[in-house]
Design a protein with these regions (language model features):
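Active-site-adjacent loop/helix surface patches within enzyme catalytic domains
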Residues: 1-86
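Short, solvent-exposed loop/turn segments at secondary-structure junctions
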Residues: 50, 94-95
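Cell-envelope/ECM-targeting effectors and their regulatory/trafficking segments
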Residues: 28-31, 63-86, 95-225
Length: 225
C-alpha cells in the first residue's frame, strides 16, 4: 500500500489524504539520522510533478503557485509539530536506493530562503572547495561525513553503487546541477561544510545567515557492513 498525508497539485491545491495522527505509507524502507523506518514518525507530502524522461518532462519547473503552497504547508507542519529544520528532507535522502524524488529540479532554495531548512555556510564551502580542488578527500572520509549528516551508507572505502546513489541524492539536494553520483571538489566542499561546526546556517527574510546547531546533535557512526 502507498499513501501520504498530503498531496500538493501543480495549481497549488493541497489535498489532505491521511490525518496527521495516523500513519501513512510514504517513506518505504527509510532511514535518517539513525532512525528507521520513518513511516511511524513522519508526515509525508507528495508533490505532483512531470517526471524526468517524459517527452516534455526534462526541464518542466515546479510552478510558483505549487511551491507557495508547499512552503506554506511545510511551515505550518514544522511549527505545529516543532520539526527541526534538518529533519525536513526529501524521499531520496531517506531512501537513496533507487529513489531521487523530489529530484534535482525541486527548488530547495525557496524553502531555505524562508528559513525552513539549513544550508551549507557559503564561506566554508568556498574555503573547502579551494582545498579540495588541489586534492579530493578519500572515499572513506566522504562516507563517514555523509553518515554523520544523516544518510544511510556503509563505510566500505570504495566508490561503490550505494555510495554513488547517496552522493547523487546529495548533489540533487545541495547543488542541483551536475548530478553525477561522482565525488568532485564542489560536492566534497558542500559535505565538509555541512558537517563542520557552525557549518549549517539558516537564512532569515532579510537574507542574513545564522548558525544552525541543534542541541543534542551527535556524530553518527558509519557502519562497515
Amino acid at each position: 500500500d502507498v499513501s501520504s498525508h498530503y498531496l500538493v497539485d501543480r495549481d497549488g491545491t493541497i489535498y489532505g489524504l491521511v490525518p496527521e495522527d495516523r500513519r501513512a505509507w510514504h517513506a518505504g524502507s527509510s532511514f535518517w539520522e539513525g532512525s528507521t523506518p520513518l513511516n511511524p514518525s513522519s508526515i509525508g507530502i507528495e508533490i505532483v510533478s512531470v517526471p524526468l524522461g517524459m517527452p516534455e518532462g526534462t526541464d518542466v519547473p515546479f510552478p510558483a503557485a505549487q511551491m507557495k503552497a508547499v512552503r506554506s504547508l511545510v511551515s505550518d507542519i514544522a511549527q505545529r509539530h516543532h520539526v527541526r529544520p534538518d529533519r525536513i528532507v526529501g524521499h531520496g535522502e531517506i531512501q537513496p536506493e533507487g529513489r531521487t524524488d523530489p529530484g534535482h529540479r525541486f527548488p530547495w532554495s525557496e524553502l531555505a530562503h524562508d528559513g525552513l531548512i539549513p544550508t551549507p555556510n557559503p564561506a566554508l564551502v568556498a574555503r573547502y572547495r579551494i582545498e579540495f580542488e588541489q586534492a579530493l578527500p578519500d572515499v572513506g572520509w566522504l562516507q563517514k561525513q555523509l553518515a554523520a549528516h544523516g544518510y544511510r551508507i556503509r563505510c566500505t572505502g570504495a566508490l561503490d553503487q550505494q555510495t554513488r546513489e547517496v552522493i547523487g541524492v546529495f548533489q540533487g539536494r545541495y547543488r542541483q546541477t551536475g548530478v553525477t553520483g561522482e565525488p568532485d571538489a564542489e560536492t566534497s566542499a558542500l559535505i565538509a561544510a555541512l558537517t563542520a561546526p557552525n557549518g549549517r546556517v539558516l537564512e532569515d527574510h532579510a537574507g542574513h545567515f545564522s548558525p544552525f546547531q541543534p542541541e543534542g546533535a551527535a556524530q553518527r557512526p558509519c557502519p562497515t557492513s
